[in-house]
UniProtKB/Swiss-Prot annotation:
Residues 142-159, 167-177 have a biased composition (Basic and acidic residues). It comes from the Eukaryota. InterPro entries: Proline-rich_CW_protein. It comes from Daucus carota. This is Proline-rich 33 kDa extensin-related protein.
Length: 211
């Protein structure tokens, strides 16, 4: 007996290739524009925190170094460390290639024929022909008119000028040293011998009793 359940046969792969599915373009849905929601900023007061006390770090005093001038010593701080020079072997250059000398034939130059110079020593100069001077008769000049000498009247007698001796230059003052006090020459002191002991003029003579 056939039940009331209808069994549909599943489509085969051949049916799928013969009837491909219908392609539908996607439906365009415009984007929904949502205005931005403006929210005022929330004020958060600053949190006051008391300063954290950090005790000072105790550092031991650094080692005392006297100056170089006091100790008169040489330290590495003042003078660099002496390093011996680095030995660099000499660079060996190859010997130059020996090339035989190139023979150059001498250049042939034709002999130069020096023509003798024509000078006065070889050929004397020809005499220069000068024309005869033109004879010109002397020009006759009439004698000059004789003029008697003009007598000028005697000039007035002027007295001879007073003799004035020539001006001489002022003598240069003699250079004198600065003013010094006069040197006083005093006579030598008269030396008086000392009186004998006990015969001072202010003291009476002392008698020697022999005690």
């Amino acid at each position: 007996a056939i039940l009331g359940v209808a069994i549909f046969a599943a489509p085969s792969l051949a049916d799928f290739h013969s009837h491909p599915p219908i392609h539908k373009p996607p439906v365009y849905t415009p984007p929904v524009h949502k205005p931005p929601i403006h929210k005022p900023p929330v004020y958060t007061p600053p949190v006051h925190k008391p300063p954290v006390y950090t005790p000072p770090v105790h550092k031991p005093p650094s080692e005392y170094k006297p100056p170089v001038e006091a100790t008169n010593s040489v330290t590495e701080d003042h003078y660099p460390i002496h390093k011996p020079p680095v030995y660099k072997p000499p660079v060996q250059k190859p010997a130059p290639e020996h090339k035989p000398p190139v023979h150059k034939p001498p250049i042939h130059k034709p002999p130069v024929h020096n023509t003798p110079s024509v000078t006065d020593d070889h050929y004397p100069a020809h005499p220069i022909h000068k024309p005869q001077p033109i004879h010109r008769p002397p020009v006759h000049k009439p004698p000059t008119e004789h003029k008697p000498p003009v007598h000028e009247p005697a000039t007035e007698h002027k007295p001879s000028p007073v003799y004035q001796p020539p001006k001489t230059e002022k003598p240069v003052p003699e250079h004198k040293p600065p003013h010094l006090p006069p040197i006083v020459v005093r006579p030598p002191p008269t030396h008086k011998p000392n009186p004998p002991y006990g015969h001072h003029p202010r003291h009476p003579p002392v008698e020697n009793t022999g005690n």
